């Protein structure tokens, strides 16, 4: 009992004590909280009332961090872009956010141009509709943003950044950064992303439409900072997207494709010359005697087709009394690669479908003759179109060279030049006639994302551009940092400029032929990153990796260049252009340097050899013309043939003479070209131009000491490489 009483007394005392203590603790905590709140309110009032410094006003801009997994999951597709513009349409008509919406593809042009879509939204009980089109621009370049060509209210280029951008200030900073390159390229036409391009479609700021472009842009940027909810209209899925207005311009890629696209012209040739194609004598007269057998074969194919069609009409209960002209038209429609429509056939729809299948089946059984006929007509049309379009091709090449020279003058390397990234600026009222005269239009830049200013900054450095490029227009140097390129080459600025030189050369070939020059060599880029990584893992020096990659690339490029030049020699020699003055100045400097370097090489070669030892014979070699050197070589070869055991000195002399002739002939040709450039008006063929450009690239970007591996047991003769390069320039 006493223990129980003692416990109760202890418990009672503890409860009373704790109650008193808790009262004081709660009071202290409440007082402290009140003081903290009061101090916070005073701090906020003081902060809002004091003047804001410039440093405080400045918005902190941070580059958003993303992971490859995020990019893969959130990749933006054409469907996402279509949905985006469907929502823009909803905002424009004022429909509810939950209004029913539909999209439908109307046509897909097989030539690769935009797909047209119909956008439909139910508003006030009625379906509102409009159209838009979308298509990809260019080849994916790995490290570069993806672009689409969209027509919606205006012609737009929509650029999706590689890494999602979530912060508006970083997005705006990126736009301004591109503007710095554009300012330096002025007055060349360039288009850059602008927020006003798309925002003004859903909200027009009062008085902004009559402002200069830059002022209007600043007004929209300020408005978006204050009205942050509108920033979402610059986003697709999780990222801000760049929008460029292309309404005033034309794509160079579309123009080049149209110059060489003979598909429609072939169909027109077939449909307009029915009597010629189905009459062997007339076929021979139009397409040449060598094609006579093809004319006979296609006439036989038509006879088989006509019999099958007439039997089909009888079996279908249709009068067999169908004119020969109608059946010829149906046959020629399929020969042109098209199908007969219900209106043209004047038959029930189900029969038209069967008719098309029947004609297609008949042609497939004689596909060899059909293909030969199509190829003959295509070749004929291409030849006619080529002659008609040569002035436009020459004009494009002239303006490509003018752009290249301008980039060099402004010390800018675009590093991803290609037809899809170049605009054509001319008077729309005169299109396409202005293409006949290069002075009536100019080429400009669509996207400057990969560009770099190679004029050294105050600290003597050149900014590091994005690595990577479009394989058909890029060199291995696109994949190495400035630091590595500076170590591998003597002149980083020159290498950056030559990246544009290479792309321009490829575009010149495409403008003249409609084809890519280095399709096989471009495949090296699929493995180039792996070679770089494996080289690093093996502990190779960066310069050794550059040499290894360059060796494989340039050997392939040299062989492919020679092959393509031989294939297209007649076409390329027939296109003449007048070199712009800016380009002549650039070319003359290159030629002078090359002549000097080759002359030094000749002297070094003669001094280092042992076959001709006396000072007199060496001087004679130095003074001799290529023809004299060649004559001497023939004498030595005849002497070797007459000897049972010729000495090694004789065989060495023959190798030396071959090499000397190559070098001297190269100097002679370069001097002739230099003399031509000194004239007030310098005309040159596309063939000579391409040879000169490739020669400079090969010697500048593929160093002589890289021609063979240092560990190779057998060193190739320098003459073999120089001879091959020379053949490409003859």
Placement of each model-derived feature along the sequence:
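ATP-binding glycine-rich phosphate-binding loop
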Residues: 73-156
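Helical subdomain adjoining the active site within ATP-dependent kinase catalytic cores
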Residues: 74-78, 279-343, 513-730
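ATP-binding glycine-rich loop module of kinase domains
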Residues: 136, 143-212, 265-298, 302, ...
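Short beta-strand micro-motifs within the conserved protein kinase catalytic domain, predominantly
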Residues: 193-237
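Conserved short submotifs of the Hanks-type protein kinase catalytic core
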Residues: 234-251
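Activation segment signature within eukaryotic-like protein kinase domains
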Residues: 396-397
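Catalytic-loop of the protein kinase fold
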Residues: 404-437
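Conserved activation segment of eukaryotic-like protein kinases, specifically the C-terminal portion
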Residues: 461-487
């Amino acid at each position: 009992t006493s223990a129980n009483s003692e416990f109760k007394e202890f418990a009672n005392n503890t409860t009373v004590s704790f109650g008193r203590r808790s009262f004081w603790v709660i009071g202290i905590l409440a007082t402290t909280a009140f003081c903290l709140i009061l101090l916070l309110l005073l701090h906020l009032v003081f902060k809002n009332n004091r003047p804001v410094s410039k440093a405080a006003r400045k918005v902190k801009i941070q580059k958003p961090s993303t992971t490859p997994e995020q990019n893969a999951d959130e990749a933006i597709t054409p469907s996402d872009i279509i949905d985006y513009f469907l929502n823009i349409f909803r905002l424009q008509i004022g429909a509810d956010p939950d209004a029913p919406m539909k999209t439908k593809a109307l046509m897909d042009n097989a030539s690769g141009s935009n797909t047209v879509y119909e956008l439909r939204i139910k508003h006030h009980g009625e379906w509102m509709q409009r159209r838009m089109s979308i298509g990809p621009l260019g080849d994916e370049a790995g490290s570069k943003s993806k672009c689409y060509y969209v027509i919606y209210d205006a012609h737009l280029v929509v650029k999706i950044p590689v890494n999602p951008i979530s912060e508006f200030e970083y997005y705006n900073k990126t736009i301004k950064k591109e503007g710095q390159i554009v300012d330096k390229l002025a007055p060349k036409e360039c288009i850059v992303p602008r927020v006003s391009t798309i925002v003004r479609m859903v909200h027009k700021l009062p008085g902004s439409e009559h402002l200069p472009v830059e002022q209007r842009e600043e007004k929209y940027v300020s408005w978006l900072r204050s009205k942050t909810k509108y920033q979402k209209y610059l986003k697709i899925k999780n990222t801000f997207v760049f929008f460029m207005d292309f309404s005033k311009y034309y794509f160079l890629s579309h123009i080049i494709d149209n110059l060489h696209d003979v598909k429609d012209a072939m169909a027109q040739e077939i449909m307009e010359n029915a009597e010629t194609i189905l009459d062997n004598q007339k076929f021979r007269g139009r397409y040449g005697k060598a094609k006579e057998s093809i004319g006979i074969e296609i006439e036989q194919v038509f006879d088989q087709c006509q019999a099958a069609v007439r039997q089909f009409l009888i079996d279908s209960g249709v009068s067999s009394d169908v004119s020969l002209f109608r059946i010829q038209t149906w046959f020629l429609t399929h020969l042109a690669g098209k199908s007969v429509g219900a209106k043209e056939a004047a038959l029930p729809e189900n029969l038209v479908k069967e008719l098309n299948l029947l004609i297609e089946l008949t042609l497939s059984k004689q596909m060899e003759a059909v293909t030969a006929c199509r190829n003959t007509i295509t070749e004929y049309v291409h030849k006619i179109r080529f002659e008609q379009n040569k002035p436009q091709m020459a004009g494009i090449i002239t303006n490509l060279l003018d752009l290249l020279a301008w980039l060099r003058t402004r010390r800018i390397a675009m590093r991803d030049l290609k037809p899809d990234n170049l605009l054509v600026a001319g008077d729309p009222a005169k299109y396409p006639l202005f293409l006949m005269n290069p002075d009536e239009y100019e080429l400009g830049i669509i996207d400057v994302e990969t560009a770099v200013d190679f004029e050294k900054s105050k600290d003597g450095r050149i900014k590091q551009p994005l690595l990577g490029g479009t394989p058909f227009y890029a060199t291995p140097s696109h994949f190495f940092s400035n630091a590595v390129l500076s170590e591998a080459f003597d002149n980083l600025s020159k290498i950056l400029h030559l990246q544009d030189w290479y792309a321009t050369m490829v575009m010149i070939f495409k403008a003249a032929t409609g084809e890519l020059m280095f399709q096989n060599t471009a495949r090296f880029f699929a493995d180039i990153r792996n070679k770089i990584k494996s080289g690093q893992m093996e502990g190779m020096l960066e310069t050794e990796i550059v040499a290894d990659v360059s060796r494989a690339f340039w050997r392939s490029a040299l062989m492919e260049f020679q092959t393509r030049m031989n294939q297209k020699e007649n076409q390329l020699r027939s296109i003449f252009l007048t070199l712009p003055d800016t380009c002549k100045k650039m070319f003359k400097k290159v030629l002078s340097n090359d002549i000097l370097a080759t002359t030094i090489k000749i002297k070094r070669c003669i001094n280092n050899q042992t076959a001709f030892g006396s000072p007199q014979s060496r001087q004679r070699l130095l003074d001799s013309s290529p023809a004299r050197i060649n004559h001497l070589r023939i004498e030595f070869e005849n002497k070797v043939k007459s000897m049972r055991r010729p000495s090694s000195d004789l065989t060495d002399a023959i190798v030396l003479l071959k090499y000397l002739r190559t070098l001297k002939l190269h100097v002679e040709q370069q001097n002739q070209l230099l003399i031509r450039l000194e004239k007030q008006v310098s005309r040159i063929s596309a063939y000579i131009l391409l040879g000169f450009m490739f020669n400079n690239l090969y010697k500048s970007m593929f160093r002589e000491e890289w021609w063979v591996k240092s560990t190779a047991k057998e060193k190739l003769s320098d003459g073999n490489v120089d001879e091959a390069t020379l053949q490409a320039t003859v």
